[in-house]
C-alpha cells in the first residue's frame, strides 16, 4: 500500500488536507475535506506541476499524460487529473471521497510531486460549450492548492 497527502492552502481562507491511498495496481482512493469555500460546486483537479512559487498559478495545466481533452471523471476522454467537482455545504466545507484509476501513486504516471488545485467555480466537465470547456472545464480561479507528497 502506498499513501500520500497534500495540505491545501492559499492566500484566501480556503484550506484542507487530502489523503491518497493505493493498494497494489488498484485505483487510488482520495479522501479529505476542504473548508472556507463558498457553498456549491468547485472544480477539483490534479495539476501537472508541483510548483507553487507563484501561488497556485504556477501549478501548470491539468495533469494530462495521454494528451486528451478535458472531461468528467467517468468519461473515456479526459485528463488524468480531471476529478470533477467537490460540493461545499452551507458551512463552506467540502468532504471528499473519490476513487480513480488514472491517478496512480507509483509508476511512470505517478501523481507524487504534482499539485491538487481547488477552483472557485464548478467544472462543466467539458460539456459547457465555453471556449475553456475542453481545456479547464471553465472552473474559474484557483482558490487553494498544495503539492502531493509521499506519506509513511
Swiss-Prot record:
UniProt keywords, alphabetically: Antioxidant, Copper, Cytoplasm, Disulfide bond, Metal-binding, Oxidoreductase, Zinc
Highest taxon in the source lineage: Eukaryota
Compartments reported by the entry: Cytoplasm
Catalytic activity: 2 superoxide + 2 H(+) = H2O2 + O2
Gene Ontology CC: cytoplasm
InterPro entries: SOD-like_Cu/Zn_dom_sf, SOD_Cu/Zn_/chaperone, SOD_Cu/Zn_BS, SOD_Cu_Zn_dom
Matches recorded under Pfam families: Sod_Cu (PF00080)
Chain sites annotated for binding Zn(2+): 62, 70, 79, 82
EC id: 1.15.1.1
PANTHER family: SUPEROXIDE DISMUTASE CU-ZN -RELATED
Subunit description: Homodimer.
Family: Belongs to the Cu-Zn superoxide dismutase family.
Descriptive protein name: Superoxide dismutase [Cu-Zn] 1
